[in-house]
């Protein structure tokens, strides 16, 4: 159903009382402006105006303005009665099915869902940290949205509506029993509200409603019911318990044909057949996991798992996958930091370890780091020489761990942000790159990371000097990892599908796939010291390779950062506590973990080689996980597999490393993805109504996040009710004007690509409306610019100016306006993460938007060329020739994708490469990288490459690029190639080819030659490229929307191409809450 229709129905559902009037606001093309002004004037002439009067005025307007020249932009609701009280609507559900709070054994008091006043003595002790849903929408609106969704479903699918109603009754009855948790203005749940209610009530209501919205059949109903009931009491281990058996089950599907990655990184089908085999250990692991489910009273899952275990069936595996996905939706486990790090602090030190293995492990780390950095040091890489500048340019606006008051030329600011501290320190001559100690006297403050189904992790918030010390080295290691297939997390040009084909490629009946979850890795205290020492040794060796004093300094402070952290103290409950483990928070965390992880698995495999004869076919590390495939000369037997598994485990324990090591023949499960029966699965575990942490986003931004998360889950096999999602969007984008007045933006605002875009009219498909009407609307919306006084004041202050000047002078030989503007913009953008600035901008933007939505006539248009103008122009000379039904064959590589998408993928093929959307493949970008630490953005490259040859020379010169290089660049007319390359990247960027489903489709598929027909003539390559890509996306969109493959032909003449080419140089990108959440670019 159309969004606007749905929103109107929903409003009637909410405002179900007499005294309410609705006023529709329209946007019209310029020629009908006076009619719209007339309409607005006539309905604003009195105090309170009757609905019938408004309706007659509206009818008058609609008869004057033809349909294609107007669109509904908002609804204004005047509700004078008592708001349709949610509590009253819930009363009919009674309290018969209400759940009762109960205490759990062996958990901390706050982890129990018991009455809040039994956890905290009084208001002074109370905190909402451990139950805060952290989202700007309320339990009331969630209930309202659910009741409306059920009432809508009754019209079309009574059977499923009954299921939803049954589940919702549990939630409603529980609310009736304890009372509705009411939030304050900032959507926080305070002591007064919570003291007589179960502590986790709000988070539980949200997660339960989220799970109810996912119910589509009996199976999902059963999963959801069990989780809803059990998560009321168990707030700690539920997700883990329910998803534990998965690890074994992935190994229990035979492979009958699969997709593999070839030598030259392409995907191809292989008809290989491999039977599954699991070891005794794994069967025991499984029975243990099942036993735990039984103890917890989770009979439904236990039965289902056991049945499937006895006779594994590829066709019902998606049902297992659903349980696995659902289990994450019970919400985040939020612990007190002192409990979260308890394990790490109390790790016992064991000297009874295999020193041989430790020595090898340590040497491997040292050699890897040495190998990675050797050339860079010998060639005196720019980024090492200017390590400090390089780090300052990419200094984030994250916390520096301490709150300071800073005076920016009269603008006082209290902030913890790194960038502000650096600017202030430089101005007051306090700035230094010396590494501050992190001992008892200066313990490290901790941040947190909450994940469903796992313990809370602590994050170090280190002083910015640590970032400066590590930045350059970490960046180089990352760059190296991008070229090494072993590092599957960083390996460039690859996506998840390639890494998957990589695994299936080597599987056969002679091979064992070992996979290890190393997530407790950080905690095992052995890791830290040996890791830091290996790093230091590698660094000392690197130091011998050069006499460059700058590089020596860089290496020295890097070594110092390692020495300091080796014996670090952290701040917990205002006490300094010694903490040995690697916590994240360092720049190098990710890459170092991967290097150590690779060294670990190589060491263990090396040890196994003394017991068996085998070939290591591949090793991969991906974050906390590692996996390897080893091929034996003979077929694998159950006995061999069991022996191998227990040996693998014993070698890990000889190093005193707490890991979960497993081996199978056909499947594996790691944190990011799991492979079973030669198919690829992802966990659809993104929470929608509970967030991990609070940020500066408004409810409007959060609506966009909600939609983006809904799409991610849907692409991973968990479909939520779209009605429910749209109603949530309707609630969260509404703007309260006064107590009685609320404004609801409509689809033409929410789904148009402007700064206000929230969702797509058709899921998985980005539509760029291209009528005259929408282009005018878009131009008007573009004129709504957010301003922030605080930001402007900071930018005017002497501190800010001198900092930008310092960066400029250090970076460029002679001031280049393009570069200095770029730096200024970047630095100013970093200020946006400072809450008061973000809020000021948002508020400013919303005030203007509110007046726009009520009366668009007073706004001036911004003359801006957007992608819509380009597509509108193209639409003038293309024809749809024919359309045929999309063939029913599905690509089953990812069985959980929606059906239409699987058919589309089967037709066009899977994409294996990401496209360059940053312009980094251009020669210009490469030359600058060679001589400077500055990385120009795509917009900047785009601007420079289109300037005169002299400007290009000047641009290069300001980065000290040798004259010889510049001459070569110009004489070989490289800039002409670059124009094309950069524009190409820019177009990819504009058409968001890395969005949602588009990133799965092979846009270079030969199939498109049959469906996009060009006229043969001498053409402008850029224009042709643009038309071609736009039409390819149009074809894909049509497949998804209508289930048809269309053939499109282009009928343009030479002037059209030239005109389009000129247009392309002025196209501007649009940023919105939608694009912020939906675009996946690394």
From Swiss-Prot:
Its main location: virion. Its cofactor is Mg(2+). Its EC number is 2.7.7.48. It is an enzyme of class 2 (transferase). It holds the Pfam family Rotavirus_VP1. Residues 498-670 form the RdRp catalytic domain. Keywords: Magnesium, Nucleotide-binding, Nucleotidyltransferase, RNA-binding, RNA-directed RNA polymerase, Transferase, Viral RNA replication, Virion. It catalyses: RNA(n) + a ribonucleoside 5'-triphosphate = RNA(n+1) + diphosphate. It is found in: Virion. One of its GO terms (cellular component) is virion component. GO terms for molecular function: nucleotide binding; RNA binding; RNA-directed RNA polymerase activity. GO terms for biological process: DNA-templated transcription; viral genome replication. Interacts with VP3 (Potential). Interacts with VP2; this interaction activates VP1. Interacts with NSP5; this interaction is probably necessary for the formation of functional virus factories. Interacts with NSP2; this interaction is weak. Belongs to the reoviridae RNA-directed RNA polymerase family. RNA-directed RNA polymerase that is involved in both transcription and genome replication. Together with VP3 capping enzyme, forms an enzyme complex positioned near the channels situated at each of the five-fold vertices of the core. Following infection, the outermost layer of the virus is lost, leaving a double-layered particle (DLP) made up of the core and VP6 shell. VP1 then catalyzes the transcription of fully conservative plus-strand genomic RNAs that are extruded through the DLP's channels into the cytoplasm where they function as mRNAs for translation of viral proteins. This is RNA-directed RNA polymerase. The lineage of its organism: Viruses, Riboviria, Orthornavirae, Duplornaviricota, Resentoviricetes.
């Amino acid at each position: 159903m159309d969004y606007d229709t749905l929103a109107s129905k929903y409003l009637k559902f909410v405002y179900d009382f007499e005294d309410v009037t609705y006023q529709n606001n329209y946007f019209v093309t310029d020629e009908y402006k006076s009619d719209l002004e007339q309409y607005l004037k006539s309905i604003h002439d009195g105090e309170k105006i009757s609905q019938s009067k408004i309706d007659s005025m509206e009818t008058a307007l609609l008869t004057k303005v033809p349909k294609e020249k107007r669109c509904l932009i908002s609804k204004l609701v005047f509700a004078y009665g008592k708001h349709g009280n949610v509590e009253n609507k819930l009363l009919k559900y009674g309290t018969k099915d209400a759940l009762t709070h109960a205490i759990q054994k062996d958990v901390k008091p706050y982890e129990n869902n018991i009455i809040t006043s039994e956890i905290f003595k009084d208001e002074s002790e109370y905190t909402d940290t451990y139950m805060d849903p952290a989202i700007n929408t309320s339990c009331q609106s969630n209930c309202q949205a659910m009741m409306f969704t059920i009432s809508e479903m009754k019209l079309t699918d009574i059977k499923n509506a009954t299921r939803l109603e049954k589940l919702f009754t549990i939630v409603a009855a529980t609310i009736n029993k304890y009372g509705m948790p009411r939030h304050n203005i900032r959507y926080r749940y305070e002591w007064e509200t919570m003291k007589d209610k179960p502590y986790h009530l709000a988070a539980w209501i949200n997660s339960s409603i989220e799970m109810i919205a996912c119910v589509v059949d009996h199976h999902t109903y059963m999963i959801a019911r069990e989780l809803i009931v059990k998560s009321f009491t168990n707030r700690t281990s539920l997700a883990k318990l329910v998803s534990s058996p998965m690890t074994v089950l992935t190994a229990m599907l035979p492979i009958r044909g699969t997709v593999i990655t070839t030598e030259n990184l392409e995907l191809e089908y292989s008809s290989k057949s491999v039977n599954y085999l699991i070891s005794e250990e794994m069967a025991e692991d499984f029975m243990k996991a099942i036993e735990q489910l039984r103890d917890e009273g989770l009979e439904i899952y236990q039965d289902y798992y056991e049945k499937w275990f006895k006779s594994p069936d590829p066709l019902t595996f998606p049902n297992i996958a659903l349980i696995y996905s659902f289990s994450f939706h019970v919400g985040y486990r939020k612990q007190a930091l002192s409990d979260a790090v308890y394990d790490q602090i109390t790790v016992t030190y064991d000297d009874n370890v295999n020193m041989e293995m430790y020595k090898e492990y340590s040497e491997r780390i040292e050699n890897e780091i040495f190998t990675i950095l050797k050339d860079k040091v010998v060639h005196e890489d720019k980024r090492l020489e200017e390590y400090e500048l390089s780090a300052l340019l990419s200094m984030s606006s994250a916390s520096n761990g301490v709150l300071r008051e800073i005076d920016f030329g009269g603008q006082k600011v209290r902030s913890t942000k790194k960038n502000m501290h650096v600017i202030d320190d430089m101005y007051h001559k306090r700035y230094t790159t010396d590494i501050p100690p992190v001992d008892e006297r200066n313990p490290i403050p901790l941040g947190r990371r909450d994940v469903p189904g796992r313990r809370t992790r602590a994050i170090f918030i280190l002083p910015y000097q640590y970032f400066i010390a590590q930045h350059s080295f970490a960046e180089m290691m990352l760059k190296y990892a991008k070229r090494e297939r072993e590092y599957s997390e960083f390996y460039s040009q690859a996506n998840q599908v390639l890494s998957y084909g990589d695994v299936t490629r080597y599987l056969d009946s002679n091979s064992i796939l070992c996979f290890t979850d190393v997530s407790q890795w950080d905690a095992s205290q052995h890791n830290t010291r040996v890791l830091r020492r290996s790093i230091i040794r590698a660094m000392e060796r690197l130091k011998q390779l050069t006499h460059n004093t700058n590089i020596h300094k860089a290496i020295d402070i890097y070594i110092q950062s390692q020495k300091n952290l080796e014996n670090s103290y952290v701040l917990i409950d205002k006490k300094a506590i010694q903490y040995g483990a690697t916590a994240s928070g360092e720049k190098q965390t990710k890459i170092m973990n991967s290097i150590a992880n690779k060294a670990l698995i190589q060491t263990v495999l090396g040890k196994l080689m003394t017991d068996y004869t085998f070939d290591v076919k591949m090793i991969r590390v991906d974050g906390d996980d590692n996996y390897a495939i080893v091929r034996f000369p003979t077929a694998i037997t159950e006995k061999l597999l069991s022996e191998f598994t227990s040996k693998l485990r014993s070698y890990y324990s000889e190093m005193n490393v707490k890991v979960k090591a497993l081996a199978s023949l056909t499947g594996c499960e790691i944190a990011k993805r799991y492979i079973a029966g030669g198919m690829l699965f992802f966990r659809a575990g993104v929470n929608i109504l509970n967030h991990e942490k609070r940020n500066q986003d408004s409810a409007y931004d959060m609506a966009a996040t909600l939609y983006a998360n809904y799409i991610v889950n849907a692409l991973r096999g968990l479909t939520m009710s779209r009605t429910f999602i749209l109603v949530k969007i309707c609630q969260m984008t509404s703007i309260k004007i006064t107590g009685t007045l609320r404004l609801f933006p409509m689809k033409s605002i929410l789904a148009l690509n402007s700064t206000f875009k929230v969702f797509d009219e058709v899921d998985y498909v980005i539509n760029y409306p291209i009528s005259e009407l929408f282009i005018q609307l878009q131009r008007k919306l573009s004129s709504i610019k957010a301003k922030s006084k605080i930001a402007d004041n900071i930018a005017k202050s002497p501190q800010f100016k001198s900092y930008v000047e310092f960066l400029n002078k250090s970076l460029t030989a002679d001031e280049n306006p393009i570069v200095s503007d770029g730096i200024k913009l970047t630095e100013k953008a970093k200020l946006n993460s400072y809450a008061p600035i973000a809020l000021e901008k948002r508020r400013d933007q919303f005030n203007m938007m509110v007046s726009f939505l009520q009366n668009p006539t007073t706004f001036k248009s911004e003359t801006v060329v957007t992608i819509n103008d380009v597509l509108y122009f193209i639409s003038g000379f293309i024809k749809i020739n024919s359309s045929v039904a999309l063939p029913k064959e599905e690509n089953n590589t990812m069985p959980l994708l929606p059906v239409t998408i699987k058919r589309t993928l089967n037709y066009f093929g899977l994409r294996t490469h990401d496209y360059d959307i940053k312009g980094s493949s251009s020669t210009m970008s490469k030359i600058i990288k060679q001589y400077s630490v500055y990385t120009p953005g795509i917009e900047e490259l785009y601007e420079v490459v289109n300037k005169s040859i002299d400007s290009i020379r000047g641009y290069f010169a300001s980065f000290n690029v040798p004259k010889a290089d510049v001459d070569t660049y110009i004489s070989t007319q490289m800039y002409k190639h670059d124009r094309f390359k950069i524009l190409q990247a820019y177009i990819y960027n504009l058409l968001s080819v890395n969005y949602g489903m588009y990133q799965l489709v092979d846009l270079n598929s030969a199939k498109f030659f049959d469906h996009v027909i060009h006229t043969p003539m001498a053409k402008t390559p850029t224009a042709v490229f643009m038309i071609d890509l736009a039409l390819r996306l149009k074809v894909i969109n049509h497949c998804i929307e209508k289930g048809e493959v269309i053939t499109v032909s282009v009928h343009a003449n030479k002037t059209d191409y030239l005109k389009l080419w000129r247009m392309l140089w002025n196209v501007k990108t649009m940023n919105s809450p939608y694009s912020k959440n939906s675009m996946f670019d690394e």
